[in-house]
Amino acid sequence: ASDVYKRQLLLVNENNATQGELTRIADVICHEIAHMWFGDLVTMKWWNGIWLNEAFATFMATKAVDVFNKDWKRWVQFGIERSAAFDVDSLHSTRPIEFEVISPDDASAMFDLLTYEKGGAVLRMLEQYVGEDQFRDGIRSYLKKHEYSNTETSDLWDSIEEFSSIPVRETMNTWIFQPGYPRIKFNNNDKK
């Protein structure tokens, strides 16, 4: 968040900057603008939900920058950049994205790779799973219902579920409240 005030991110010469530098600048600006909705307009009730503010800002920054410049292929980079979070998430010492926060150290621990990177990736997966229009309608509903108030993660899942035939809360709880990857059980009764 403090990057947005660094001189090199605000005073850039487009002719001398690399694509990586320009992408980083656009990402940071869009990330901070996304906080106007997730973090400012709607704020989480407690620190355990702060991941949603940061993950949503990470996800929306990529979405906005991809629209701004398709040549930068932000969704390809998004997948590559998130791989480190999934590596950390495969360790036995990993934690869930959302966990009970009872101390200042717990709150500080929320600002890590899993919050930003895995959280952003999980939101992208949800958007692809329920459909872009349904996801956007759910986000709009959530922001309208909870503007200038405090929410919990489940409030977002419930809003998206209103526009989808998928049990969003049930699906997302396995990704958010369990460490690591959720187990998927496949049963092929068709024998094909």
Predicted regions and their residues:
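Hydrophobic alpha-helical and helix-loop surface patches within well-folded domains
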Residues: 2-192
